[in-house]
Amino acid sequence: MAVRVSKAERQRLLREKINENPFYTDDELADMFGVSVQTIRLDRMELGIPEVRERIKNVAEENYRKVKTILGAEVVGELIDLELGKRGISIFEPTEDMVFVKTKIVKGQYIYSQAESLALSLIDAPAALIGVANIKYKYPVKVGDRLVAKAEVIRQRGNKYFVWVKIKVKEKEVFRGKFILVALEEDFLKKRSDTVEVGN
């Protein structure tokens, strides 16, 4: 949207864009409208629209209530979309304490944790475990990158869920994982751990 418009029209369009996609950053909106980031911030303040972090947090809080297998607070990143047994999306922004000091590259354990917790969130059962994980780190991640993870249940066979997770930074895929998760019933928590089969 390179054409300049009046302030009133820009604010109308801004509200429309944010309603369509609440995850646009001020930088992205400034580029869309051909104005400064400060102008977008002022427009948002006048319209009473919170910043992107607050918008993401609001959407995530609604989705955390749907999760059955783990606590919402255990999901790594913000859970912005969830359809139990089908698909989900989370957003995660690594911080400085999550990197290797020498290279400033985000440690793989945090990226894996985002994928694992999103996969677990999809399962419509009281508890679940990862039985098998086939993962691939495809590109290094740095602080400031916004990781968008999309997970989908590809098929279900009995109590086993086959889940694919792809994590991207912008349009570049940085991680891919195929998981087999085993759904566990409530009585699992009462059994000894050596009586439950997870793999195969």
Swiss-Prot record:
> Which Gene Ontology BP terms does the record give?
fatty acid biosynthetic process; negative regulation of DNA-templated transcription; negative regulation of fatty acid biosynthetic process
Answer whether the UniProt record assigns the keyword Lipid metabolism to this protein.
yes
User: Mind listing the UniProt keywords for this protein, alphabetically?
Assistant: DNA-binding, Fatty acid biosynthesis, Fatty acid metabolism, Lipid biosynthesis, Lipid metabolism, Repressor, Transcription, Transcription regulation
| CDD domains recorded | hot_dog (cd03440)
Q: Which InterPro entries match?
A: HotDog_dom_sf (IPR029069), Thioestr_dom (IPR006683), Transcription_factor_FapR (IPR017275), WH-like_DNA-bd_sf (IPR036388), WH_DNA-bd_sf (IPR036390)
As one GO molecular function, the record gives:
DNA-binding transcription factor activity
Give the function comment from the record: Transcriptional factor involved in regulation of membrane lipid biosynthesis by repressing genes involved in fatty acid and phospholipid metabolism.
Q: Which family does it belong to?
A: Belongs to the FapR family.
Tell me what this protein is called: Transcription factor FapR
Q: Which organism is it from?
A: Caldanaerobacter subterraneus subsp. tengcongensis (strain DSM 15242 / JCM 11007 / NBRC 100824 / MB4)
Organism lineage string: Bacteria, Bacillati, Bacillota, Clostridia, Thermoanaerobacterales
- What is the name of the gene encoding this protein? fapR
